[in-house]
Protein backbone atom coordinates (compact mmCIF):
# COMPACT_ATOMS: atom_id res chain seq x y z
CA UNK A 1 0.00 0.00 0.00
CA UNK A 2 1.40 3.36 -1.01
CA UNK A 3 1.58 6.34 1.32
CA UNK A 4 -1.22 8.07 -0.59
CA UNK A 5 -3.47 5.01 -0.40
CA UNK A 6 -2.82 4.74 3.32
CA UNK A 7 -3.72 8.38 3.81
CA UNK A 8 -6.94 7.94 1.83
CA UNK A 9 -7.87 4.91 3.94
CA UNK A 10 -7.07 6.63 7.21
CA UNK A 11 -9.03 9.72 6.20
CA UNK A 12 -12.26 7.67 6.31
CA UNK A 13 -11.42 5.39 9.24
CA UNK A 14 -13.84 5.50 12.19
CA UNK A 15 -11.88 3.31 14.62
CA UNK A 16 -8.61 4.35 16.27
CA UNK A 17 -6.47 1.36 17.37
CA UNK A 18 -5.54 2.92 20.71
CA UNK A 19 -9.00 4.33 21.51
CA UNK A 20 -11.05 1.26 22.39
CA UNK A 21 -14.20 3.32 22.82
CA UNK A 22 -14.22 3.97 19.06
CA UNK A 23 -14.38 0.21 18.50
CA UNK A 24 -17.21 -0.39 20.96
CA UNK A 25 -19.26 2.62 19.82
CA UNK A 26 -19.37 2.20 16.06
CA UNK A 27 -20.60 4.80 13.58
CA UNK A 28 -22.24 4.12 10.24
CA UNK A 29 -20.82 5.19 6.91
CA UNK A 30 -23.85 4.38 4.76
CA UNK A 31 -26.34 6.98 5.99
CA UNK A 32 -26.46 8.89 2.72
CA UNK A 33 -27.48 5.76 0.81
CA UNK A 34 -31.13 6.45 1.67
CA UNK A 35 -31.01 9.74 3.59
CA UNK A 36 -29.78 12.80 1.68
CA UNK A 37 -27.22 14.88 3.58
CA UNK A 38 -27.69 13.08 6.92
CA UNK A 39 -25.40 15.51 8.76
CA UNK A 40 -27.45 18.55 7.65
CA UNK A 41 -29.57 19.83 10.57
CA UNK A 42 -33.26 19.95 9.62
CA UNK A 43 -35.38 22.84 10.85
CA UNK A 44 -38.88 21.49 10.13
CA UNK A 45 -38.81 17.69 9.77
CA UNK A 46 -37.30 14.77 11.72
CA UNK A 47 -36.21 12.21 9.10
CA UNK A 48 -34.24 9.00 9.46
CA UNK A 49 -33.09 6.33 7.02
CA UNK A 50 -36.52 4.70 6.97
CA UNK A 51 -38.42 8.00 6.77
CA UNK A 52 -36.29 10.41 4.70
CA UNK A 53 -39.17 12.91 4.52
CA UNK A 54 -40.00 12.83 8.22
CA UNK A 55 -43.30 11.82 9.82
CA UNK A 56 -46.12 11.43 7.27
CA UNK A 57 -49.08 13.79 7.83
CA UNK A 58 -47.37 15.55 10.75
CA UNK A 59 -47.81 19.32 10.45
CA UNK A 60 -44.86 21.40 11.53
CA UNK A 61 -46.79 24.71 11.49
CA UNK A 62 -43.57 26.59 10.88
CA UNK A 63 -42.07 25.49 14.20
CA UNK A 64 -38.57 24.12 14.60
CA UNK A 65 -38.33 20.43 15.44
CA UNK A 66 -37.51 21.27 19.07
CA UNK A 67 -40.49 23.62 19.24
CA UNK A 68 -42.68 20.86 17.78
CA UNK A 69 -41.38 18.53 20.50
CA UNK A 70 -42.87 20.69 23.26
CA UNK A 71 -45.89 22.12 21.41
CA UNK A 72 -48.11 19.20 22.47
CA UNK A 73 -48.13 20.64 26.00
CA UNK A 74 -49.30 24.07 24.81
CA UNK A 75 -52.95 23.13 25.25
CA UNK A 76 -54.39 26.56 24.41
CA UNK A 77 -51.97 27.17 21.51
CA UNK A 78 -50.82 30.57 22.76
CA UNK A 79 -47.10 29.80 22.58
CA UNK A 80 -46.69 29.57 26.36
CA UNK A 81 -46.71 26.40 28.47
CA UNK A 82 -47.74 26.84 32.10
CA UNK A 83 -47.25 24.14 34.76
CA UNK A 84 -50.93 23.20 34.72
CA UNK A 85 -50.66 22.58 30.96
CA UNK A 86 -47.60 20.38 31.44
CA UNK A 87 -49.49 18.51 34.15
CA UNK A 88 -52.56 18.12 31.91
CA UNK A 89 -50.40 17.00 29.00
CA UNK A 90 -48.88 14.18 31.01
CA UNK A 91 -52.34 13.17 32.19
CA UNK A 92 -53.45 13.01 28.54
CA UNK A 93 -50.51 10.67 27.92
CA UNK A 94 -51.67 8.32 30.67
CA UNK A 95 -49.34 9.25 33.53
CA UNK A 96 -50.87 9.13 36.99
CA UNK A 97 -51.57 12.17 39.17
CA UNK A 98 -48.40 12.01 41.24
CA UNK A 99 -46.04 11.43 38.30
CA UNK A 100 -47.72 14.20 36.30
CA UNK A 101 -47.44 16.62 39.21
CA UNK A 102 -43.76 15.87 39.83
CA UNK A 103 -42.87 16.07 36.14
CA UNK A 104 -44.80 19.30 35.59
CA UNK A 105 -43.16 20.98 38.58
CA UNK A 106 -39.68 19.78 37.66
CA UNK A 107 -39.92 20.66 33.97
CA UNK A 108 -41.38 24.14 34.35
CA UNK A 109 -39.14 25.12 37.26
CA UNK A 110 -36.05 23.89 35.40
CA UNK A 111 -36.82 25.33 31.97
CA UNK A 112 -38.92 28.44 32.54
CA UNK A 113 -36.29 31.07 33.29
CA UNK A 114 -34.11 30.29 30.28
CA UNK A 115 -37.06 30.84 27.92
CA UNK A 116 -38.41 34.08 29.42
CA UNK A 117 -38.36 37.15 27.15
CA UNK A 118 -36.86 39.31 29.92
CA UNK A 119 -34.48 39.08 32.87
CA UNK A 120 -37.03 39.00 35.69
CA UNK A 121 -38.21 35.52 36.74
CA UNK A 122 -41.92 34.72 36.73
CA UNK A 123 -43.64 33.15 39.75
CA UNK A 124 -45.89 31.27 37.32
CA UNK A 125 -42.96 29.41 35.68
CA UNK A 126 -44.13 29.72 32.06
CA UNK A 127 -42.15 28.15 29.22
CA UNK A 128 -42.07 30.29 26.07
CA UNK A 129 -41.97 27.99 23.07
CA UNK A 130 -40.22 30.48 20.77
CA UNK A 131 -37.26 30.50 23.18
CA UNK A 132 -37.18 26.78 23.98
CA UNK A 133 -33.78 26.42 22.28
CA UNK A 134 -32.31 28.48 25.13
CA UNK A 135 -33.31 25.74 27.59
CA UNK A 136 -31.35 23.02 25.79
CA UNK A 137 -29.09 21.30 28.31
CA UNK A 138 -25.76 19.53 27.92
CA UNK A 139 -24.97 15.82 28.15
CA UNK A 140 -27.64 15.10 25.55
CA UNK A 141 -27.54 13.16 22.28
CA UNK A 142 -26.81 16.34 20.25
CA UNK A 143 -29.71 15.39 17.97
CA UNK A 144 -31.04 18.92 18.50
CA UNK A 145 -28.58 21.66 17.70
CA UNK A 146 -28.40 24.88 19.72
CA UNK A 147 -31.07 26.49 17.55
CA UNK A 148 -33.54 23.62 17.85
CA UNK A 149 -32.88 21.96 14.51
CA UNK A 150 -32.75 18.18 14.22
CA UNK A 151 -29.66 16.31 12.97
CA UNK A 152 -30.70 12.90 11.59
CA UNK A 153 -27.18 11.46 11.69
CA UNK A 154 -27.12 11.75 15.47
CA UNK A 155 -30.30 9.72 15.79
CA UNK A 156 -28.73 6.99 13.66
CA UNK A 157 -25.54 7.13 15.74
CA UNK A 158 -27.51 6.33 18.90
CA UNK A 159 -28.30 2.93 17.48
CA UNK A 160 -24.99 2.14 15.79
CA UNK A 161 -23.23 2.94 19.08
CA UNK A 162 -25.55 1.51 21.70
CA UNK A 163 -28.12 -0.91 20.20
CA UNK A 164 -26.37 -4.22 20.86
CA UNK A 165 -29.42 -6.50 21.17
CA UNK A 166 -31.73 -5.35 18.37
CA UNK A 167 -30.37 -2.95 15.72
CA UNK A 168 -33.32 -0.53 15.78
CA UNK A 169 -34.30 -0.76 19.46
CA UNK A 170 -32.74 0.15 22.79
CA UNK A 171 -33.18 -1.72 26.05
CA UNK A 172 -33.29 0.09 29.38
CA UNK A 173 -29.68 -0.90 30.03
CA UNK A 174 -28.62 0.38 26.62
CA UNK A 175 -30.40 3.67 27.27
CA UNK A 176 -28.48 3.95 30.53
CA UNK A 177 -25.20 3.28 28.70
CA UNK A 178 -26.11 5.97 26.17
CA UNK A 179 -26.77 8.60 28.82
CA UNK A 180 -23.49 7.66 30.48
CA UNK A 181 -21.66 7.94 27.16
CA UNK A 182 -23.19 11.36 26.46
CA UNK A 183 -22.10 12.91 29.75
CA UNK A 184 -20.18 16.18 29.61
CA UNK A 185 -17.67 16.82 32.39
CA UNK A 186 -19.13 18.43 35.55
CA UNK A 187 -22.55 18.89 33.90
CA UNK A 188 -24.52 17.62 36.87
CA UNK A 189 -27.82 19.13 35.75
CA UNK A 190 -27.43 17.67 32.26
CA UNK A 191 -26.62 14.21 33.64
CA UNK A 192 -29.80 14.18 35.71
CA UNK A 193 -32.02 15.81 33.09
CA UNK A 194 -30.93 13.36 30.41
CA UNK A 195 -31.67 10.31 32.55
CA UNK A 196 -35.07 11.67 33.60
CA UNK A 197 -36.05 12.50 30.02
CA UNK A 198 -35.08 9.11 28.64
CA UNK A 199 -36.67 7.38 31.63
CA UNK A 200 -39.97 9.16 31.00
CA UNK A 201 -39.86 8.28 27.31
CA UNK A 202 -39.11 4.65 28.17
CA UNK A 203 -42.09 4.56 30.54
CA UNK A 204 -44.31 6.06 27.85
CA UNK A 205 -43.28 4.19 24.73
CA UNK A 206 -41.35 0.98 25.50
CA UNK A 207 -42.84 -2.19 24.05
CA UNK A 208 -43.94 -5.42 25.75
CA UNK A 209 -40.41 -6.82 25.52
CA UNK A 210 -38.88 -3.83 27.29
CA UNK A 211 -37.37 -2.08 24.26
CA UNK A 212 -37.70 1.49 23.03
CA UNK A 213 -37.92 1.56 19.25
CA UNK A 214 -36.10 3.89 16.91
CA UNK A 215 -39.43 5.01 15.47
CA UNK A 216 -40.74 5.99 18.91
CA UNK A 217 -37.58 7.99 19.59
CA UNK A 218 -37.68 9.71 16.20
CA UNK A 219 -41.32 10.67 16.68
CA UNK A 220 -40.57 11.92 20.17
CA UNK A 221 -38.13 14.41 18.67
CA UNK A 222 -40.83 16.00 16.47
CA UNK A 223 -43.59 15.61 19.06
CA UNK A 224 -45.83 13.42 16.90
CA UNK A 225 -45.36 10.54 19.37
CA UNK A 226 -47.21 12.51 22.05
CA UNK A 227 -50.19 13.09 19.77
CA UNK A 228 -50.24 9.39 18.88
CA UNK A 229 -50.01 8.21 22.50
CA UNK A 230 -52.65 10.68 23.69
CA UNK A 231 -55.06 9.50 21.00
CA UNK A 232 -54.47 5.85 21.92
CA UNK A 233 -54.92 6.54 25.63
CA UNK A 234 -58.16 8.44 25.00
CA UNK A 235 -59.50 5.50 22.97
CA UNK A 236 -58.59 3.06 25.75
CA UNK A 237 -60.33 5.23 28.36
CA UNK A 238 -63.41 5.52 26.17
CA UNK A 239 -63.50 1.76 25.65
CA UNK A 240 -63.21 1.08 29.38
CA UNK A 241 -65.93 3.65 30.13
CA UNK A 242 -68.25 2.20 27.52
CA UNK A 243 -67.85 -1.37 28.75
From Swiss-Prot:
Catalytic activity: RH + ROOH = ROH + ROH
Source species, domain of life: Eukaryota
Locus of motif Proline-knot: 117-126
Entry's localization field: Lipid droplet
Pfam families registered for this protein in UniProt: Caleosin
Residues carrying N-acetylthreonine: 2
Enzyme class of the recorded protein, top EC level: oxidoreductase
Cofactor(s) needed: heme b; Ca(2+)
Chief location category: other
Tissue/organ expression: Expressed in roots, cotyledons, hypocotyls, leaves, shoots, flowers, siliques and dry seeds.
Comment, domains: Transmembrane regions are predicted by sequence analysis tools, but these regions probably constitute hydrophobic domains associated to phospholipids.
Similarity-based family: Belongs to the caleosin family.
Assembly and interaction partners: Homodimer.
Protein name (record): Peroxygenase 2
